[in-house]
Amino acid sequence: MKRILAVFAVLAVMSGAFAAQPKTMVYSVRGTDTLRADYYSVQAPSAPCVVFMFGGGFYSGSRASSSYTDYFEFLNEKGYGVFSIDYRLGLKALDGMSEKPSLGRMVGLLTGSVDMAVTDLYEATAFLLKHADELGVDADRILVCGSSAGAISVLTGQWGLARRRAEGILPTGFDYAGVISFAGAIYTVQGAPRHYAPSCPVMMFHGSADSNVPYRKLALGKIGFYGPQYLTKRMNRTEAPYYWCDFQDADHKIAVSPMNSNREQIAYFLENYVEKGARLQITENIRNLDQPAHKGKIGIMDYVRSNFGEQ
């Protein structure tokens, strides 16, 4: 009996290791940038797939970071393939500057960075649609998920579909089956998304003391970031489905930690919102009583210091 159990244990370990081994492929070439993706497939003829975008402030990060691989395995176990992608990091242009850029120049760089990341998201999605049969992907069930800068990209990307931002890349009428954002926000230079009514369910995780990505909003004229507190208020008015995990007094660690500690909520979202089409609005307030309460308002300079250091 012990020998039989030992054999099963070895097979289980081998199975887990095999499931975690992705297939790497090129999904797009943009100028001198060759963009690759790691595809973590599941054993199914036509499975839903999550396009994942890593975090790193549009400056750094990796599609293959060990911070995410356990989460990818969890998604595989739930029957979802994962397409973890490279995307162009526009703020790496800061490396070549001898002087600190002006505010106007910084806004231009940030806008260009988000635009490039969103375009790369659309390109990755188009690749999946084109190769859906050979990759075993259900083209009607492609979701997007991101951490921090990646979360900004997926929220902004899905919002941009209704604004014809993907024209010429994705088929007319295409939409994602769902969005999962770990510490993200919509970034726009066209004014606030006052009538925010995403046509697919959205799940958001965010900490109220996050000084990297706005929990509420951070706007200067028509330029701004709009976080989940702002977005869910609009979604209440437009009756759009969402699941928001609101971490009181938590900082930017929410860009990663829920991938491990809040899988029950993610599984609920996938099963009920994505698979069953439930039209629910859930806000889950989470407070760690061992964590000091955050006092004071987070201002624009707090975001500047958190993302770019002392200016």
Locations of regions flagged by a protein language model:
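Short amphipathic alpha-helix adjacent to the substrate-entry channel of hydrolases
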Residues: 63-85, 92-94
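C-terminal catalytic histidine-bearing segment of alpha/beta-hydrolase fold enzymes
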Residues: 38, 236-311
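Alpha/beta-hydrolase active-site loop
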Residues: 100-134
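Short beta-strand element of the alpha/beta-hydrolase
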Residues: 46-57
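Serine-hydrolase catalytic-loop signature spanning alpha/beta hydrolases and amidase-signature enzymes
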Residues: 57-60, 82, 127
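The feature captures the conserved acid-bearing segment of alpha/beta-hydrolase catalytic domains
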Residues: 167-239
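N-terminal cap/lid segment of alpha/beta-hydrolase-fold proteins
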Residues: 19-45
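Primarily recognizes the serine-hydrolase "nucleophile elbow" in alpha/beta-hydrolase
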Residues: 124-198
